[in-house]
Amino acid sequence: MFHHRGGCTPRAQTPYAANVPIVAEQQQFQQQIDQTANAMGNFQLNDNAYSFTQPAQQPQQPSSRKVANQLYPVDLFTELPPPIRDLSLPPPPITISQDSIVTPSETSNVPYQYVRSTLNAVPKTSSLLKKTKLPFGIVIRPYLNLQDSSEYVPLNNDGIIVRCRRCRSYLNPFVAFIEQGRRWQCNICRFKNDVPFGFDQNLQGAPINRYERNEIKHSVMEYLAPIEYSVREPPPSTYVFILDVSQNAVRNGLLATSARTILENLESLPNHDGRTSVSIICVDHALHYFYVPLDDDYEESDDDDDEDDDDEEEDNEEEEEEEEDEEDDDDSITEAIQMFDVGDLSEPFLPMPSEELVVPLRYCKKNLEKLLKTIPEVFQDTHISKFALGPALKAASYLISNTGGKIEVISSTLPDTGVGKLKRRAEQGVLNTTKESSQLLSCQDSFYKTFTIECSKMQITVDMFLASEEYMDVATLSHLSRFSGGQTHFYPGFNATSLNDVTKFTRELSKHLSMDISMEAVMRVRGSTGLRATSFFGHFFNRSSDLCAFSTMPRDQSYLFEISIEDSLVAEHCYLQVSTLLTLNTGERRIRVMTLALPTTESGREVYASADQLAITDFITQNAVAKALNSSMDSARDLITKSLQDILSAYKKEISMSNITAVTSLNLCANLRMLPLLMNALGKHIAFRPGMVPSDYRASSLNKLETEPLHYLIKSIYPTVYSLHDIPDEVGLLDSNRETKLPDPINATASLFERYGLYLIDNSTELFLWVGGDAVPELLNDVFNTDNISNVPVGKSELPVLIDSPFNVRLRNIISKIRENNDTITFQSLYTIRGPSINEPANLTAEREMASLRLWVSSTLVEDKILNCASYREYLQSMKTAINR
């Protein structure tokens, strides 16, 4: 046992373009639109609008004309069931004339996975934008993978960073070299700058071709930032773990589970520069700090460095002595660890200097492992139910106030002691009323707002892992992450006796801890003259009108910035450049630059034809989340409905009025035909749907929508449904690319469910396996090794492993493929649900559980009328009625 001191009141070498297909997906988009065009009439598309010229050695000759995306109107009522394959299509192509690019190539414009605009043709005037009622914003994802080594972005390390003297934008593929190449004209503000000395030379002074430079060829690239981009030496990555050791956390197994998970992942913490540091604070009604000494073998190796070996015999003698001492190593190390209790929560203080309590992982790893093994034993018999989170947060901030870092809170108890103490809010009579947002989704204590301001000053991020069967006030606690660049993860009903609960928690915490991070990051968007970023959505601290600050920048979040047109755009193209200054765990200061070029237009038809329905969905979602948190749930729902209604009305007025069928149909362009479906589904999402939704669940869902990368957000709004009982022979097996082939999805409606069928539903957070109540014994045997549906396990459980059943193997392959990801920490638990059957045995307890699960599944079938929300057909009819008034 440790001493208890009481009394203290190389990156992967693949260019990103290879990982981010562009041309093939644009061709896919063209083919999809062509199918619609053929159905509507003999429309023709120009191939040049949908592909770039192959990379050239020298700048191309000016293009003589500009080709725009074509608009194809559709009647939404003839598009039933909706063609959900559109949800997997890339956005409408961005048509940039070749003469506006220094060296045209597939990497000249930013891939949409990094920066995605709601409009791929920008109105030249604010009045035209208002006429269309379409929103203008960009979805930003600075990193695409949890580990930086999985993503190659070109790096300039020659110290030459070329920026415009007027607007401070960075040199990019869309500038113009003028005056025999001695100067360059900024594409953002049109200012003429001098080309710096050394621009056409390498580090050795040898001449190079400037058209081969990264900033000329690539719209996504990085600079190694010189010293003037830093205000101090790069800090080490520092993690402070606040562990809940109250009775509830011990009883449900969270303490033991989290301690073991942290122990197993100490080696996985980002530690590229060998400077990563760790501290642990255990919290109940007091604060328990730990002094962790250097590992014995580190001390011995230090001594050995100062000594010369006399001969091999002496070495052998020393090794024998070390072996004799090995039996005592565990006891000696554990005894050297000391715990200090601080019970004065009004003014929590550090019992030792912070450098004694925050220890280098490199030199203390073994002792940290000893400590993490011991902590569950020390508190296993506790009867203390209190949890002083507020004082613990203040103490953790004292520990790392000089370096910044991450505070990882793992808790199972509502904070009820000291500053920031919370109480259970009365939900009865408030849920599903106009008071829901103000009384249940607001921050209960101002401490959680003011503390994040201090965190931003000290470069500290707070992540929350809340796992409990009790009320946790996620709405209040999520403020800690929302404004510090972190995330709140919620595990309702967690209990370590459930293997599935433990699996999900440990998988997600492990991926979170191993995820690369950036420190002391700031992000800014610069736009062409006339464009300005005005609203910002995501988890960060908005330090000024256009500067977003991240104490640490994670790899699994995205952000959305609204863009306003403040002056008319006179040029044929406009530009948005996202620059992020950050410090990597390697100790390097980097600047990541992403430049997006967009055509401008005076045609409303072109604006509609180039609108991105998925990015628009994200835009409306972020604004609805803000409404729900800052106003009311009704105002959030009204925003969703009105946003779509305005777009449909404007489209009818500006585009469809010449069509005689405009009154009897509901028209929209083909590239936006999924938008009504997504808005109908968004209103049924747990974050927004009316009904008695527990506030913790509502707050957690709103929090997740704020940061979810776009493809996961779309799946959480419109779940992917697979029919499994009739999959083709090749599905569930490896294809020619050694990837497991997934079945084609079907529409999310119960009308397609057969009573004997087997279906898998993926909502990005969970997986649901629906077993039809009349499933045949052969199917049940192949999947579950039973021919009686009553014996099929229901609830949270994995499929049995039946190696003698090829069908079972294929289904498990499909589930594994869906869970396979390297861009999110989410691990999707599998829930098995039996459909109703006339032979279902009467069991009141089982019936209640089954009814709850069936209701949950029905909420994912978003094309149906569910939970007092209109079906998709009814929704379209209501929209048609509204715009024809």
Curated annotation (Swiss-Prot):
Pfam families: Gelsolin, Sec23_BS, Sec23_helical, Sec23_trunk, zf-Sec23_Sec24. The keyword Metal-binding applies. It is a peripheral membrane protein. Zn(2+) binds at residues 164, 167, 186, 189. GO terms for cellular component: COPII vesicle coat; endoplasmic reticulum exit site; endoplasmic reticulum membrane; Golgi membrane. One of its GO terms (molecular function) is zinc ion binding. It is found in: Cytoplasm; Cytoplasmic vesicle, COPII-coated vesicle membrane; Endoplasmic reticulum membrane; Golgi apparatus membrane. It comes from the Eukaryota. GO terms for biological process: COPII-coated vesicle cargo loading; intracellular protein transport. Keywords: Cytoplasm, Cytoplasmic vesicle, Endoplasmic reticulum, ER-Golgi transport, Golgi apparatus, Membrane, Metal-binding, Protein transport, Transport, Zinc. Residues 164-189 are annotated as: Zinc finger-like. PANTHER family: SEC24-RELATED PROTEIN, SECRETORY 24AB, ISOFORM A. Component of the coat protein complex II (COPII) which promotes the formation of transport vesicles from the endoplasmic reticulum (ER). The coat has two main functions, the physical deformation of the endoplasmic reticulum membrane into vesicles and the selection of cargo molecules. The COPII coat is composed of at least 5 proteins: the SEC23/24 complex, the SEC13/31 complex, and the protein SAR1. Golgi apparatus membrane; Peripheral membrane protein; Cytoplasmic side. This is Protein transport protein SEC24-1. It comes from Saccharomyces uvarum (strain ATCC 76518 / CBS 7001 / CLIB 283 / NBRC 10550 / MCYC 623 / NCYC 2669 / NRRL Y-11845) (Yeast). The lineage of its organism: Eukaryota, Fungi, Dikarya, Ascomycota, Saccharomycotina.
